[in-house]
């Protein structure tokens, strides 16, 4: 199974949008308004694409060239965080948060393949955007949305 996400950051609205750009599996194909676009044309995405599912309140590390300190996954039906994820995931993310060299990313990749892409690739039920919630770090949020409880390690 292989799946890719295209990330579009709208700094004017502090919104991070992720969309599928392709899939290779025996699962059901993407359909509806989120039809895959070629990965070489990220600018073809409209500025309001998926705005209703966008994430607000990004920590400052989201804008770093090195990327965010940690990732949490959420969808319309479930919440997986560094708190309730498998035991090895919080350990790896915490090490990264502290700036230490982390273990191999194989376990993280496996975790996200199993949890994040299961609905897309195997069940074919979720056609809306999947959203990665940035958090789990010592950086302050740009603005904290009321319904979201960000995990902090510091």
Curated annotation (Swiss-Prot):
One GO BP: DNA-templated transcription
GO CC annotation, single: host cell nucleus
Residue segments, region Mitochondrial targeting sequence: 68-117
Keywords assigned: Activation of host NF-kappa-B by virus, Activator, Apoptosis, Host cytoplasm, Host G2/M cell cycle arrest by virus, Host mitochondrion, Host nucleus, Host-virus interaction, Modulation of host cell cycle by virus, Transcription, Transcription regulation
Compartments reported by the entry: Host cytoplasm; Host nucleus; Host mitochondrion
Entry PTM: A fraction may be phosphorylated in insect cells and HepG2 cells, a human hepatoblastoma cell line. Phosphorylated in vitro by host protein kinase C or mitogen-activated protein kinase. N-acetylated in insect cells.
A Pfam family: X
Family: Belongs to the orthohepadnavirus protein X family.
Known partners and oligomeric status: May form homodimer. May interact with host CEBPA, CFLAR, CREB1, DDB1, E4F1, HBXIP, HSPD1/HSP60, NFKBIA, POLR2E and SMAD4. Interacts with host SMC5-SMC6 complex and induces its degradation. Interacts with host TRPC4AP; leading to prevent ubiquitination of TRPC4AP. Interacts with host PLSCR1; this interaction promotes ubiquitination and degradation of HBx and impairs HBx-mediated cell proliferation.
Role description: Multifunctional protein that plays a role in silencing host antiviral defenses and promoting viral transcription. Does not seem to be essential for HBV infection. May be directly involved in development of cirrhosis and liver cancer (hepatocellular carcinoma). Most of cytosolic activities involve modulation of cytosolic calcium. The effect on apoptosis is controversial depending on the cell types in which the studies have been conducted. May induce apoptosis by localizing in mitochondria and causing loss of mitochondrial membrane potential.
Entry protein name: Protein X
Organism the protein comes from: Chimpanzee hepatitis B virus (isolate United Kingdom/LSH/1988) (HBVcpz)
